[in-house]
Amino acid sequence: MVKKYKVIDNFISKEALSGILLLFVTLFAIIVANSNFGDFYFNLWDKPLGVAIGDFIISMPLRLWINDGLMALFFLMVSLEIKRELLIGELASVSRAMFPFVASLGGMIVPASIYIALNPDNFIGFGIPMGTDTAFAIAMLILLGKRVNTALKLFLVALAVIDDLGAIIVVATVYTSELKLEYFLHAAFVYGLIWLLNYFDVKKLSFYLFLGIFLWIFIHETGVHATIAGVLLAFAIPISSRMNEKKFIEKTKADLEEFERCMDDKPILNHRQINALEGIAYGYDRVQNPLIRLEHDLHGFSAFFIMPIFAFSNAGVLLDFSTVWTNWMIVLGVALGLLVGKPLGIFGFTYAATKLNIIKKPKNISWFEIISVGFIAGIGFTMSIFIANLAFIDEDTISAIKIGIFTASFMATVIGMILISINYKFKISKA
């Protein structure tokens, strides 16, 4: 239990720092896009880059290498988190998972419904207000400090994990071009090989990652969004380690005793001590769960490299509000979906399901706090931008949507933080 909460604490702290970094990167991108360097900024991401393997060539603009390539690693990390939560985390128990599941369901259905109601002719953008930027949302809760209890943070993490799963399903099923059967068969063959590794209990991550590269290539060529390769790979990564904890402790103790026995007066280690250290390193490598190890390695890389790069390349928008008026119904649908749909859906679905005795509300979270977190979940930002780039092609439309996303996310942040602060003061006054 202690180990589980330590994993969650590490997750929350990294996400919080990443969220603050993303805020600065986003502001910098907007400043650059509207400065004298604006043309250079926009042209940079359209520069073509190609990779050739024999006669096979993949050539894409730099922005797509980020959105399809680096973001595949991000979705790999997210899917590893989802798998961990489903197997050993907050979502492992059906009773505990039901409340955030219903909340997330409402937080996706209501925003999408609001968007579709306002944009029946442009319904393809319904996925944009469904997203929650986990890093930003958690960062806002961390900034509130002791005003947010641990249970509320865990609820937001569970909500965000299920939300990410919903986003993955939408990307895989809705924002996919015409399928090419030939490459689909290639991808299926490679994925079959990956599962063979899992079946034969292969724990070496390098084998999975090597085949994962080919899986990404073939899925990219099928017409399915290439980030789905990261999702598929994650669910094939084994969770069990090559050495159990008890055996690791016994072996490490034996190696440490050997190291101590072989100590001498010389200032350098002798061969037997080096062998003992290698034995400890061997045990250290084998006791780690492949899934947890890969998630840990990717988390920092994703939080402090992939997402800032994605934000910098995609958040830059010309503050030309004429594009907003041209696309005002789409912008309104996105903004209201995030600002109104998220809190309304999260609160409404959980409240109704609780009254119908379908789920039980956690005792240490109030309904007022659920509404507050509903607004915080309305911070769509990077996930909403990512889906906007898939849903629309016209640059002016995407720019207008970005302005709507920024505005709604900012307002949702302010309202959510104010409500949580009011709730804290009310609790203090009653104490």
Curated annotation (Swiss-Prot):
Principal cellular location given in the protein's record: membrane
Topological relation to the membrane, as annotated: Multi-pass membrane protein
Assigned GO CC terms: plasma membrane
UniProt keyword terms in alphabetical order: Antiport, Cell inner membrane, Cell membrane, Ion transport, Membrane, Sodium, Sodium transport, Transmembrane, Transmembrane helix, Transport
Record has Ion transport as a keyword: yes
Reactions catalysed: Na(+)(in) + 2 H(+)(out) = Na(+)(out) + 2 H(+)(in)
GO biological process: regulation of pH
Highest taxon listed in the record's lineage: Bacteria
Molecular-function annotations in GO: sodium:proton antiporter activity
Database matches in InterPro entries: Na/H_antiporter_dom_sf, NhaA
Xref: HAMAP family: NhaA
Family assignment from sequence similarity: Belongs to the NhaA Na(+)/H(+) (TC 2.A.33) antiporter family.
Function of the protein: Na(+)/H(+) antiporter that extrudes sodium in exchange for external protons.
Name this polypeptide is given: Na(+)/H(+) antiporter NhaA 1
